[in-house]
């Protein structure tokens, strides 16, 4: 999931840093109906709100992107995303066959280069040139339970 922290300052000892957390919201729901034929609808939304405090080196609304750290599988330039996944599964005795369609759309912002330094918004958000990238995926399921 989306999360991390940023460097917001240098402590009085001039060696240690002060940190600020990233803030985000993640909401997911899964609804299922039926037994022999199962209808499933999964949906979710994630919003990145940036860091609590401005990042170290912030000026004119931008800060060095190197002062922002995200978890390994996250993207620091992601602004928001949503996912919708309808699924149908037919249970036939010990067999089950299913089909799932997944639609995921993510809004990314671009980094800005200032004096040769890759920068992000002072609050840790990449909000320049926001654009959506959408992915479609279809998966099939065949299962035998013994």
Where are each of the predicted segments found?
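Residues on the lipid-exposed face of transmembrane beta-strands in outer-membrane beta-barrel proteins
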Residues: 27-33, 86-90, 99-101, 140-144
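Outer-membrane beta-barrel and related beta-rich outer-membrane complex signature
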Residues: 51-57, 109-117
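Short acidic-glycine motifs
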Residues: 112, 128-131
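Detector for outer-membrane/organellar transmembrane beta-barrel domains
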Residues: 1-78, 82
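Outer-membrane beta-barrel "beta-signal"
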Residues: 132-146
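Repeated loop/turn-to-beta-strand initiation elements of outer-membrane beta-barrel proteins
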Residues: 37-41, 94-99
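Transmembrane beta-strands of outer-membrane beta-barrel pores
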Residues: 43-49, 92-94, 103-107, 144-146
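Low-complexity, intrinsically disordered Gly/Pro/Thr-rich segments
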Residues: 118-129
């Amino acid at each position: 999931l989306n999360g991390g922290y940023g460097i917001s300052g240098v402590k009085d000892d001039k060696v240690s840093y002060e940190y600020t957390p990233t803030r985000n919201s993640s909401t997911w729901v899964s609804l299922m109906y039926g037994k022999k034929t199962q209808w499933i609808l999964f949906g979710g939304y994630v919003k990145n709100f940036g860091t609590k405090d401005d990042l170290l080196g912030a000026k004119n609304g931008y800060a060095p992107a190197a002062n922002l750290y995200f978890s390994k599988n996250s993207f620091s330039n992601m602004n928001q995303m949503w996912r919708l996944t309808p699924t149908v599964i037919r249970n036939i005795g010990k067999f089950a066959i299913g089909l799932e369609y997944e639609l995921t759309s993510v809004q990314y912002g671009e980094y800005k280069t200032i004096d040769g330094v890759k920068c992000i918004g002072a609050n840790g958000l990449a909000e320049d040139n926001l654009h959506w990238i959408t992915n479609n995926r279809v998966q099939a399921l065949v299962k035998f339970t013994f």
